[in-house]
Swiss-Prot record:
The lineage of its organism: Viruses, Duplodnaviria, Heunggongvirae, Peploviricota, Herviviricetes. Used in molecular biology as a selectable marker to identify transfected eukaryotic cells. Used in cancer suicide gene therapy to selectively kill transformed cells. Gene3D superfamilies: P-loop containing nucleotide triphosphate hydrolases (3.40.50.300). Substrate binds at Y101, Q125, R222. ATP binds at G56, P57, H58, G59, M60, G61, K62, T63, R216. Residues 1-39 are annotated as: Disordered. It comes from Human herpesvirus 1 (strain CL101). Pfam families: Herpes_TK. This is Thymidine kinase.
Length: 376
């Protein structure tokens, strides 16, 4: 692609850089490599941690399933990190969820402009994303390399998170873009803020027939929520695209090589259930990248402005390392719990980085739950 020379010439640049001073650096690098090897051996003796992020569209039964799973373990070896409802409703702002739904309703009724709605939605999503992003940053220093999943002993600690940072920093902004209440520029601004993906990031997405999903959502009571079927369709579509995007990237897909295969229109808010890693690599048109071939992001020659291309590079870098699992929610709560438990046997653990990491992580998770877990 003519507008992205950095991709075309990266290998030549790297080759030239390596050729300068190579012999001088060889000796200097040897002690560093020995130190790194020692650090790896020490890390492999550390306890292991399993992190599971239960994510997907709202109203499927994620929280119920997670709480049932957590109840199977002891208080010391499995810890639940809930949605930060108190932060959303009290600490970070007042009634953020109600504000989001009211703003979308007013836009749909023609009471406010798309621009006015976008200002409110962007501010609200900052509030929604902050607890996830900062918690990820505090946790990161304690997460070491991946320990693998085959024949691994039980982890010293299992953390079950109610959502990953990408929910608030990617999926819900993208759905609001499909709903007309957020700009594509704002969505990519959130993408740029997604924290680097830690090793052993296991994300569980959900599958549930749409009619069953609507029925479950209609029966639950969450502060400030409205039954918005258009938004439900949009967020279901986005999570389907997310699963496809991870498969596309892990299968060797390159957005900048395949960009020309995209049409000039964003996908409609409808689509199939998320799929597991089985099957052929998805077409780029069935991934999140298709959302960003939008006129607002294109230069006069029809190519993406480089700043937006860089944001898509960030998106690819964040999603590629994720371990994605699909949970069938079309069963009883106990059945969902058992299916989730079975999925965990194939998930990837990590070593922690210090002898004190496990109690520190436990304290972090329980502090989060105590301070932000339930609205007062």
């Amino acid at each position: 692609m003519a507008s992205y020379p950095c991709h075309q010439h990266a290998s030549a640049f790297d080759q030239a850089a390596r050729s300068r001073g190579h012999s001088n650096r060889r000796t200097a690098l040897r002690p560093r490599r020995q130190q790194e090897a020692t650090e790896v051996r020490l890390e492999q003796k550390m306890p292991t941690l399993l992190r599971v992020y239960i994510d997907g569209p709202h109203g499927m039964g994620k929280t119920t399933t997670t709480q049932l799973l957590v109840a199977l373990g002891s208080r010391d070896d499995i810890v639940y990190v809930p949605e930060p409802m108190t932060y959303w409703q009290v600490l970070g702002a007042s009634e953020t969820i109600a504000n989001i739904y009211t703003t979308q309703h007013r836009l749909d009724q023609g009471e406010i402009s798309a621009g006015d709605a976008a200002v409110v939605m962007t501010s609200a999503q900052i509030t929604m994303g902050m607890p996830y992003a900062v918690t990820d940053a505090v946790l990161a220093p304690h997460v070491g390399g991946e320990a693998g999943s085959s024949h691994a002993p039980p982890p010293a600690l299992t953390l079950i998170f109610d959502r990953h940072p990408i929910a608030a920093l990617l999926c819900y902004p993208a759905a609001r873009y499909l709903m007309g209440s957020m700009t594509p520029q704002a969505v990519l601004a959130f993408v740029a803020l997604i924290p680097p993906t830690l090793p052993g990031t296991n994300i569980v997405l959900g599958a549930l027939p749409e009619d069953r999903h609507i029925d479950r959502l209609a029966k639950r009571q969450r502060p400030g929520e409205r039954l918005d079927l258009a938004m439900l369709a949009a967020i279901r579509r986005v999570y389907g695209l997310l699963a496809n995007t991870v498969r596309y990237l892990q299968g060797g897909g390159s957005w900048w090589e395949d960009w020309g295969q995209l049409s000039g229109t964003a996908v409609p808010p409808q689509g199939a259930e998320p799929q597991s890693n089985a099957g052929p690599r998805p077409h780029i048109g069935d991934t999140l990248f298709t959302l960003f071939r939008a006129p607002e992001l294109l230069a006069p020659n029809g190519d993406l402005y480089n700043v937006f291309a860089w944001a898509l590079d960030v998106l690819a870098k964040r999603l590629r390392p994720m371990h994605v699992f699909i949970l069938d929610y079309d069963q009883s709560p106990a059945g969902c719990r058992d299916a989730l438990l079975q999925l965990t046997s194939g998930m990837v653990q990590t070593h922690v980085t210090t002898p004190g990491s496990i109690p520190t992580i436990c304290d972090l998770a329980r502090t989060f739950a105590r301070e932000m877990g339930e609205a007062n």
